[in-house]
């Protein structure tokens, strides 16, 4: 079994979703410290800030998603958004590139770094 590739936009959305659940869990932990109002409030505020951070990440990736190149995946024939020089299909995780110099090369995320010279 080969390496499982994942789309960058989906990775960031998954991170934002995990921030929501982590924030809710941290805020819920504050309930166990009802006797000490300072600790309870601290847990609730940190949890709230994590949920707000997830909102910011969702907003950021939404704005970034509007600027991406939309292409049709040659493997599954569904439209997908591509971020950077190399990315994976959102639906079938097929490695994709629009750079002719990278066609046929092994998929590697280092190709998206500015320091990489092809």
UniProtKB/Swiss-Prot annotation:
Give the source's domain of life in one word: Bacteria
Q: Which subcellular locations apply to this protein?
A: Cell membrane
Q: Major place of localization?
A: membrane
Q: What protein am I looking at?
A: UPF0295 protein BCE_0593
| UniProt key word Repressor | no
An example Pfam family from this entry, by short name, is DUF2614
A GO cellular component entry from the record: plasma membrane
Q: How does it sit in the membrane?
A: Multi-pass membrane protein
- Which keywords describe this protein according to UniProt? Cell membrane, Membrane, Transmembrane, Transmembrane helix
Report whether Cell membrane shows up as a keyword of the record: yes
Transmembrane domains' residue ranges: 12-32, 43-63
Similarity comment: family membership: Belongs to the UPF0295 family.
């Amino acid at each position: 079994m080969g390496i499982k590739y994942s789309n960058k936009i989906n990775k960031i959305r998954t991170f934002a979703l995990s921030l929501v659940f982590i924030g809710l869990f941290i805020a819920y932990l504050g309930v166990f410290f009802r006797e000490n109002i300072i600790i309870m409030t601290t847990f609730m505020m940190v949890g709230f800030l994590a949920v707000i951070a997830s909102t910011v990440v969702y907003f950021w990736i939404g704005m970034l998603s509007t600027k991406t190149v939309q292409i049709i995946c040659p493997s599954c024939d569904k439209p997908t958004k591509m971020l950077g020089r190399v990315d994976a299909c959102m639906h079938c995780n097929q490695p994709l590139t629009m750079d002719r110099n990278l066609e046929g090369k092994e998929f590697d995320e280092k190709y998206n770094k500015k320091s990489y010279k092809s």
